[in-house]
Swiss-Prot record:
NCBIfam families: S20. One of its GO terms (cellular component) is small ribosomal subunit. It comes from Leptospira biflexa serovar Patoc (strain Patoc 1 / ATCC 23582 / Paris). It holds the Pfam family Ribosomal_S20p. Keywords: Ribonucleoprotein, Ribosomal protein, RNA-binding, rRNA-binding. Binds directly to 16S ribosomal RNA. The lineage of its organism: Bacteria, Pseudomonadati, Spirochaetota, Spirochaetia, Leptospirales. This is Small ribosomal subunit protein bS20.
């Protein structure tokens, strides 16, 4: 147990950050799951809508250093390839 006032504050701050980061990570996984579901169903308009939201969430997560910027870019790139594969299958 921390004795210093600043150490106790650090513990509280860390707990708040951990909770917020966990919520944000969960949100990222949820949007990724929704996008994959839309891609598998072949619904391009839904996939593009969800991709836009996911892209925004990934950029925000990278900005707040929840994930690395290159990790966010890689995930967006791979999801874009999957969305483009919908067109290829339809054609």
């Amino acid at each position: 147990m921390a004795n210093l006032k600043s150490s106790k504050k650090d513990i509280r701050r860390t707990a708040r950050r951990k909770e917020r980061n966990g919520e944000d990570r969960t949100e990222l996984r949820t949007y990724a799951r929704l996008l994959i579901k839309a891609i598998k169903s072949g619904d391009k308009t839904e996939a593009l809508t969800v991709f836009s939201k996911l892209s925004s969430k990934l950029d925000r997560a990278a900005k707040t250093k929840l994930i690395h910027k290159k990790n966010a870019d890689r995930k967006k790139s791979r999801m874009a390839l999957r969305i483009n594969s919908i067109e290829a299958k339809a054609a």
